[in-house]
């Protein structure tokens, strides 16, 4: 390994220009200089971690206007230790028994359905029973002496006070003495007051390595001191189910330094700078006939960034937004951005396709590189997308499927019920669920898609391979869960006489 700017390339890993946002999978953010310097200085000495946590907690309270603060192991780690605090109350005899909550007075967490998400594994890991509710009335009816906590994600509407808002939930919960944890992981930080604490939340959790640009492995908890002292007790270096959520002295100091820096950053000027990046890109690519651009300014706190949408007719350019995003992310210099026209990937309109550029994690000079790359990519001559070849086989029927995961073999089943020329429909039975299966056959090349969907979880299956008579084989892409291999054998039904 080489140290310095080429550290990643020396390992055979090509860095990316981040035009997508604070996604952990691409590194989320870069440290503010103050955090970088603070972490370097922190690593030079030893310190007693409980004493450090008290000093950091007090200073975070001074900076934020909250009663107390804790640096956690990421936002998810913060959610976990806050849940542990809610069920233990700071009682170490309870702490060391988690996740076995037998004998605990409180073992339930209420979550509004719209707040159920993959990150609530951090809460489920504690062993609590999750109570999912759809309305404010259901939430209030679900509150009982066994309710340890309510977890929620805030509304994206500024100032929302309607049903299931932070304000409405906190008001109802306060009457029953139930703490409310707000997950504000990707939000811009608000201080003196924090908007969610001002709305009545007990604790608010942030990711340290997103908008705040602190250590990527750190999180930030602000709120009620008693609950947060129990949360700190639940985390490393203290033993128990939170021992794996370690926060080192460097992360503690780096996170505090990032919050200190946040109070001094010129946020309005930063947004003007980010908009300037997008204007540079927009001016360059809009010179191409048939390409349109629009810049959207942020209105809320979540993922607060100006965004540029670049749209075109896929029939004229022979490329979809996903084609363009894939090309830009897999060729040098690599650029990570989003496909689709609107927020969260929504298409711009029926006849347009697009890519979106988020500006807030771009670095000086990135705008010119990105402008040239997108201009050149859109200017390339591409052959028209060819018509699909005639299918080489009739795939209707049942298929026994063997999937080879990294360290396990699993048996699944395809039931292909319809084959309309190149288009296929049916079902995919996995080890745990049965799901819709859709796909295509192009000559002997097959692509199937299904998803094992559960409340707050989704395991995607994209099968791609080839068919040869009554057998199929190829690879499976599972999104964030990486890849596996599959083989399938058609079940030949005996002919009736």
What are these regions (language model features)?
Residues 15-25, 34-43, 305-310:
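Generic N-terminal amphipathic, Lys/Arg-enriched alpha-helix
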Residues 248-314:
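Active-site pocket-lining segment
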Residues 354-356, 364-398, 406, 487-497:
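Amphipathic/hydrophobic helical signal segments and adjacent flexible N-terminal regions
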Residues 391-497:
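Central antiparallel beta-sheet cores of small beta-barrel/beta-sandwich binding domains
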Residues 2-26, 30, 54-72, 76-267, ...:
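Conserved PLP-enzyme active-site core in the AAT-like
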Residues 7, 286-379:
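Conserved C-terminal alpha-helix-loop-beta "cap" of PLP-dependent enzymes
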Residues 42-50:
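N-terminal alpha-helical segment of soluble enzymes
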Residues 49-54, 68-69, 242-246, 265-275, ...:
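Flexible, glycine/charged-enriched surface loops at secondary-structure junctions
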């Amino acid at each position: 390994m080489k140290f310095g700017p080429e550290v990643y390339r020396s390992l055979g890993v090509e860095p990316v220009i981040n035009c997508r946002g604070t996604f952990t999978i691409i590194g989320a953010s870069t440290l503010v200089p103050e955090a970088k310097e603070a972490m370097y200085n922190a690593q030079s000495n030893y310190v007693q971690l409980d004493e450090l946590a008290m000093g950091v907690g007090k200073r975070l309270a001074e900076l934020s206007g909250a009663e107390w603060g804790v640096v956690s192991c990421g936002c998810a780690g913060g959610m976990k230790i806050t849940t542990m605090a809610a069920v233990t109350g700071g009682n170490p005899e309870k702490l060391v028994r988690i996740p076995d909550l037998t004998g605990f007075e409180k073992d339930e967490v209420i979550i509004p359905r719209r707040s159920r998400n993959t990150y609530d594994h951090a809460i489920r890991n504690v062993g609590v029973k999750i109570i999912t509710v759809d309305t404010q009335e259901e939430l209030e009816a679900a509150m009982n002496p066994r309710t340890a906590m309510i977890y929620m994600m805030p509304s994206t509407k500024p100032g929302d006070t309607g049903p299931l808002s932070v304000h409405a939930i906190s008001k109802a919960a306060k009457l029953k003495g139930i703490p409310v944890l707000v997950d504000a992981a990707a939000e811009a930080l608000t201080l003196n007051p924090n908007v969610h604490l001002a709305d009545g939340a007990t604790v608010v959790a942030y990711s340290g390595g997103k908008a705040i640009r602190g250590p990527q492995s750190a999180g930030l908890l602000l709120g009620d001191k008693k609950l947060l002292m129990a949360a700190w007790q639940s985390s490393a270096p203290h033993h128990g189910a939170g021992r794996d959520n370690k926060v080192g002295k460097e992360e503690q100091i780096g996170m505090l330094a990032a919050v200190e820096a946040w109070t001094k950053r010129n946020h309005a000027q930063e947004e003007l700078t980010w908009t300037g990046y997008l204007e540079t890109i927009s001016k360059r690519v809009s010179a191409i006939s048939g390409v349109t651009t629009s810049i959207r300014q942020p209105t809320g706190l979540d993922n607060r960034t100006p965004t540029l949408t670049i749209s075109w007719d896929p029939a004229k350019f022979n490329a979809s937004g996903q084609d363009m995003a894939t090309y830009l992310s897999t060729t040098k210099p690599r650029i990570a951005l989003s496909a689709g026209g609107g927020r969260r990937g929504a298409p711009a309109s029926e006849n347009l396709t697009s890519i979106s550029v988020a500006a807030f994690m771009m670095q000086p000079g990135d705008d010119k590189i990105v402008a040239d790359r997108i201009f050149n990519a859109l200017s390339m001559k591409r052959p028209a997308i060819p018509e699909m070849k005639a299918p080489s086989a009739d795939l209707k029927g049942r298929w026994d499927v063997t999937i080879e995961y990294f360290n396990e073999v699993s048996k699944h089943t395809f039931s292909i019920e319809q084959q309309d020329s190149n288009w296929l429909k049916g079902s995919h039975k996995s080890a745990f669920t049965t799901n819709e299966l859709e796909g295509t056959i192009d000559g002997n090349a097959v692509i199937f898609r299904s998803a094992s969907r559960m409340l707050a979880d989704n395991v995607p299956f994209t099968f791609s391979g080839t068919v040869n008579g009554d057998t199929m084989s190829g690879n499976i892409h599972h999104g964030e869960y990486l890849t596996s291999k599959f083989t399938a054998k058609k079940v030949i039904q005996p002919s009736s006489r």
